Amino acid sequence: MVRVMAQGVFDLLHLGHVHYLCRAKELGDELVVVVASDATVRRRKHEPITLQDMRVELVGALRCVDRAVIGSEGGDPYAIVAELRPDIIALGYDQEHDEREISAELKRRGLPTRVVRLDYYDHDLDGTRKIISKILSMWSISKAIDRIEERPAEAKAAPEAGTDSGAPRSKKGGRRRG
């Protein structure tokens, strides 16, 4: 049986994550996913939006995932590899790990694990930052519309000072002279 290990934060689970994990599963018979602990996320990226228990449950609920575990809180990042003993570590196309460095360290530790970089996946909402950006953009537009709609009716209909936009129109659409 070929065991594949994938890893990530998986904060705001999205299609890019699903694609990564399903592609990783295709490399073997069993997929074990290491979900970054809250402490690791805080140290390396940002305050997590969803906590580790929720993230590991969401990832574990995916059909392609056989088991999801929470990674260690710090220390040796290779300890989990020694514990899980995967045949393959699948890296996402956008993960900032150097597969040659990982392979060299695994070899140095006597772990016969192969490291595979998965191919690029493109979708307009395939990343957490893209999703957050779209939400903020939509929220900004929504707030602008709300501000316009909250203006009193007189302010919406009243002509601007110094214009003749309140003058009656002739049948041809021009302004009638008074």
Predicted regions and their residues:
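Nucleotidyltransferase catalytic core that binds NTPs
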Residues: 1-178
